Every structure is written in structure tokens, then in C-alpha cells.
From Swiss-Prot:
<dbReference type="InterPro" id="IPR006261">
    <property type="entry name" value="dGTPase"/>
</dbReference>
<dbReference type="Pfam" id="PF01966">
    <property type="entry name" value="HD"/>
</dbReference>
<protein>
    <recommendedName>
        <fullName>Deoxyguanosinetriphosphate triphosphohydrolase-like protein</fullName>
    </recommendedName>
</protein>
<dbReference type="Pfam" id="PF13286">
    <property type="entry name" value="HD_assoc"/>
</dbReference>
<comment type="similarity">
    <text>Belongs to the dGTPase family. Type 2 subfamily.</text>
</comment>
<dbReference type="InterPro" id="IPR023023">
    <property type="entry name" value="dNTPase_2"/>
</dbReference>
<dbReference type="InterPro" id="IPR026875">
    <property type="entry name" value="PHydrolase_assoc_dom"/>
</dbReference>
<feature type="domain" description="HD">
    <location>
        <begin position="52"/>
        <end position="187"/>
    </location>
</feature>
<keyword id="KW-0378">Hydrolase</keyword>
<dbReference type="GO" id="GO:0016793">
    <property type="term" value="F:triphosphoric monoester hydrolase activity"/>
</dbReference>
<dbReference type="InterPro" id="IPR006674">
    <property type="entry name" value="HD_domain"/>
</dbReference>
<dbReference type="InterPro" id="IPR003607">
    <property type="entry name" value="HD/PDEase_dom"/>
</dbReference>
<dbReference type="InterPro" id="IPR051094">
    <property type="entry name" value="Diverse_Catalytic_Enzymes"/>
</dbReference>
Length: 365
């Protein structure tokens, strides 16, 4: 298939193909539910914390800026970025890990993967047309959703779909840009959220070269650490610095300007896009610090422990009592749908708040 083509013919309008993709994503119910899904901190913890929705918007802004600088297709990058987290479960990665464990326990060997679930949302679960499932997005956007993060999960697709989406090859350069924009956004903004709510201090991260350099830069701007604006200047400088580090390592990509595909580069070969070696080294150290200092903070662990328990209980409830499911999902099972797959789709679609309220309704009353 050509990048701009769709699996189902549909009347085109005045927009370009990737603008239509972006608009369909923004208007779908799964996108709206991202407002109440956890990034790192549970949504109920405070209205300041970033959610999957705000994160997706931030990723799309960074991805568009990078794509523009490299002469790539900005709108395709935006569409992939806005949809890249549609498949996330409630309670962040802890929820996804628990659903993965439960699916494997019930005989679904491939388990759960949020990238594939995002693909499943836009290609099957969203119901927008009378004659086919999904949002009918272009091939390039679907491929970017499926393959924006390496390694690619071949076990989720049949042989025909593996061949169509060429999982032995890298995706478009725009999809690779989104993967790195995602990394830039979550590292910077998780630090921001963590500091805001007292889970970490900048001093806890100063052994990171990146953090030290950005602290120095903010101080050189005449901002004192005691000032509220210091955190904003630090985060802004960190994002800019990471973007420049990516652009510095991606000059070769200019040779591919105007192309949507990545010239079918085998997945084991080096890409023309990526952080410079120095920036890659610094970022790796910072992420390691964040893992120990923030992502494994006791308050985060407690919330994630609750989230895993909530998903586990709901999954077992629905598997044991199918009549607890919405009628349309009961019908899917009665018509031959695999119960564990139907239940997983349902739970993955829930917001944090909905999952917590349903858990309380079934177990506390």
C-alpha cells in the first residue's frame, strides 16, 4: 500500500490525508478518555498532574517542531503522536503489566502491549462507519502507531498483516520522530510533576549532567532556585536541549526530505534519526536516576499497587461473571469472541476514575 492509502475507500474532502487522520483521532471517544488516564501519578492525586491526554498533546507539539525542522511531514507526525497512547490501560504502565500477566495466565500467549492496543483501537474497536470497523486511517498513520516504538510485536498480527506492515523494517521517519518526542516529553514533564508535588527535588537529580547543565542555564538567566519560575525555566531549557540533541544526531535524515517511508530500512540497521551520542549517554543516565528516585518512589508504588489490584479484580470478576459486562460485550462473546480478549479491551478502555468506581461498586458496595 502507498502511505496515503486507506484499507476502505471513502469520499475525500478538502483536507490532506493525514489531516483527516488527525481530525478523526481527535474526535474519537478513546482520545477523550485519555483526559482521565494516568501518565505516572494517579489522576485522582491532583488536577495539576499530567494525564495521557496532556502528554499526547505535548508529544504532538514536539514531534511537529522536529518534523518541520527536518523537512518531514508535520501532519503525519502529529497524527501518530496524538494516537500513540490510545491503547494505554488505566493506572499507567502498572495497569498494562497486570493486564499482560492476566492475558498470558488465561492462555493468550502474546499478552498485552499498549502499542498494539492503540492500533487495535483505531483499526477495530472505534465504531464510526456502518460497513467497517475502526477509523479508516491511512496506511502511514496505522504503521506509525504500530511501529513507533521498537521492538515491534510480531506475535499480535497474523502473517498477512505482518507482511503488509513489514515488521522486519523500520517505520516512516515521522514515526521515529514521534518515538523520540515521546521520550523528550515524558522525561521533562515527569520531573516537573515530581517536583511540583514534592516527590523529588532537583538536588536529587544533580548527579545527572543534563540536570546540572539545565540548572546552571536557568541560574544564568538570573532566576533563583527559590523562585517558582525556576522550575518552568528548567523544564523549558531541558526540552529545548533534548530537541537540539536529537536534531544534531539526525542531520542525515535531511537526505530523506519529502519521503514518508524510511526507504524500508531493516529493523536491525542504524537509522538516520536519533540523539547524538553525547546526548544519548546523558539521557540514559538521567532516565536511570528517574527510575530509582521517582518511578519507584513509595507514593507512586502504593498507587500502582492499588491499580494492579483493581485491574486484577475486575478482570477476574468479568471472566467469572460475564453478565457483569455491558450487553454489547456479552453479545460479542456469545457470537464467538474470545472472552479474555473482550474483557481486556473493555478494561483497557477505562479511565482511572471509571475503573476505581466500578471496583468499589463491585467489591465495596
Amino acid at each position: 500500500m502507498r502511505p496515503h492509502e486507506r484499507f476502505h475507500d471513502f469520499l475525500d474532502d478538502f483536507r490532506n490525508p493525514y489531516s483527516r487522520d488527525r481530525d478523526r483521532i481527535i474526535h474519537c471517544s478513546s482520545f477523550r478518555r485519555l483526559e482521565y488516564k494516568t501518565q505516572v501519578f494517579l489522576n485522582s492525586s491532583g488536577d495539576y498532574f499530567r494525564t495521557r491526554l496532556t502528554h499526547s498533546i505535548e508529544v504532538s507539539q514536539i514531534a511537529r517542531s522536529i518534523a518541520s525542522h527536518l523537512g518531514l511531514n508535520e501532519t503525519l507526525a502529529e497524527a501518530i503522536a496524538l494516537s500513540h497512547d490510545l491503547g494505554h490501560t488505566p493506572f499507567g504502565h502498572a495497569g498494562g503489566d497486570e493486564l499482560d500477566r492476566l492475558l498470558k495466565k488465561h492462555g493468550f500467549e502474546a499478552g498485552f502491549d499498549h502499542n498494539f492496543q492503540s492500533f487495535r483501537v483505531v483499526s477495530k474497536l472505534e465504531k464510526r462507519y456502518p460497513n467497517f470497523e475502526g477509523l479508516n486511517l491511512t496506511f502511514a498513520t496505522l504503521e506509525g502507531i504500530l511501529k513507533h516504538s521498537y521492538p515491534y510485536q510480531k506475535s499480535f498480527l497474523d502473517a498477512a498483516m505482518n507482511e503488509i506492515f513489514a515488521l522486519d523494517y523500520h517505520p516512516s521517519l515521522e514515526a521515529i520522530v514521534v518515538d523520540h518526542a515521546d521520550e523528550i516529553a515524558y522525561v521533562s514533564h515527569d520531573i516537573d510533576d515530581g517536583i511540583k508535588y514534592g516527590l523529588i527535588r532537583l538536588e536529587d537529580l544533580e548527579e545527572s549532567e543534563l540536570v546540572g547543565e539545565m540548572i546552571d542555564k536557568a541560574e544564568q538567566e538570573g532566576v533563583k532556585r527559590s523562585e517558582k519560575v525556576f522550575r518552568y525555566r528548567f523544564v523549558s531549557n531541558l526540552i529545548n536541549h533534548l530537541v537540539y540533541g536529537f536534531l544534531e544526531g539526525s542531520q542525515e535524515a535531511r537526505l530523506h526530505q519529502g519521503e514518508v517511508r524510511s526507504a524500508m530500512i531493516p529493523s536491525g540497521e542504524r537509522l538516520p534519526l536519533g540523539f547524538s551520542p553525547e546526548m544519548g549517554r546523558k539521557l540514559k543516565k538521567l532516565k536511570k536516576l528517574l527510575f530509582t528516585k521517582l518511578y519507584r518512589h513509595e507514593q507512586v508504588n502504593r498507587k500502582m499497587f492499588f491499580g494492579r489490584g483493581c485491574i486484577r479484580a475486575l478482570f477476574e470478576d468479568f471472566m467469572n461473571e460475564k453478565n457483569l459486562l455491558p450487553k454489547e460485550l456479552q453479545e460479542r462473546i456469545n457470537q464467538g469472541g474470545k472472552a479474555h480478549r473482550v474483557v481486556a479491551d473493555y478494561i483497557a478502555s477505562m479511565s482511572d476514575r471509571y475503573a476505581m468506581n466500578l471496583y468499589k461498586e463491585l467489591h465495596i458496595g
